[in-house]
């Protein structure tokens, strides 16, 4: 990995998409069958406000340093990387060998709203970002089971830390060609298209 994407200037707009490979077939009788293969990944498409050369140059230099699609890097999309809940405490994975679409956790402050559906989280030791799919609060002991998508790509270690604020996405550029536009105003226009990598 080759660093963290610059945080200034911030994205003017951000489009996030979830990509999940699913095969669907329908028989003559109308019966539908579906199956999933491969893993889910996030795609982030961001555009910047018009920038001066001094603002734009460090961003474009970072992009060029990725050598097209070769390198991966970390990006923290400010608009979505901090959740709508009020998590507090020292959250950890509670037990090894977890699989599936839920996380058993502990170490939260007691009886608080941790996540709202649509929040993101990340587990130490893994580059994958997960979305919380249902509101969740901690119980009186500071424990919580969190519903997530996609399913865990690897079983997290017991006591692995959980990142719930400023969640970093590990991404790579989606194209080898990176183009900007400028004109007589001296302002630069730029968009970047990234996809999650593990």
Question: What would you call each of these model-derived segments?
Answer:
Residues 4-48:
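N-terminal ordered "arm"
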Residues 5-19, 83-86, 95, 110-111, ...:
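Small/polar beta-strand repeat architecture
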Residues 13, 43, 70-72, 118, ...:
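Exposed beta-strand and adjacent loop surfaces of beta-rich binding modules
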Residues 33-52, 182-198:
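Oligomerization/assembly interface segments of phage tail-like spikes and tubes
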Residues 36, 63, 122, 136-138, ...:
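Generic marker of residues within folded, mature protein domains
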Residues 54-58, 147:
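Exposed alpha-helical structural elements
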Residues 58-66:
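Short amphipathic alpha-helices in soluble, non-transmembrane regions
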Residues 67-117, 122-128, 138-139, 143:
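Autoprocessing Asn-cyclization modules and mimics
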């Amino acid at each position: 990995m080759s660093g963290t994407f610059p945080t200034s200037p911030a994205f003017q707009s951000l489009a996030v998409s979830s990509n999940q490979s699913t095969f669907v077939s329908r028989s003559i009788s109308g019966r539908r069958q579906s199956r999933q293969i491969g893993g889910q990944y996030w795609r982030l498409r961001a555009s910047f406000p018009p920038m001066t050369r001094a603002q734009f140059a460090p961003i474009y230099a970072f992009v060029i340093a990725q050598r097209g699609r070769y390198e991966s890097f970390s990006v923290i999309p400010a608009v979505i990387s901090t959740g709508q809940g009020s998590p507090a405490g020292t959250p950890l994975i509670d037990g090894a060998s977890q699989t599936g679409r839920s996380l058993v956790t502990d170490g939260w402050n007691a009886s608080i709203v941790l996540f709202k559906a649509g929040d993101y989280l990340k587990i130490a030791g893994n580059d994958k970002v997960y979305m919380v799919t249902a509101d969740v609060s901690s119980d009186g002991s500071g424990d919580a089971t969190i519903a997530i998508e996609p399913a865990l790509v690897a079983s997290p270690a017991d006591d692995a830390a959980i990142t719930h604020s400023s969640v970093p996405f590990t991404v790579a550029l989606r194209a080898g060609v990176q183009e900007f536009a400028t004109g007589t105003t001296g302002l630069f226009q730029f968009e970047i298209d990234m996809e999650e990598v593990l």
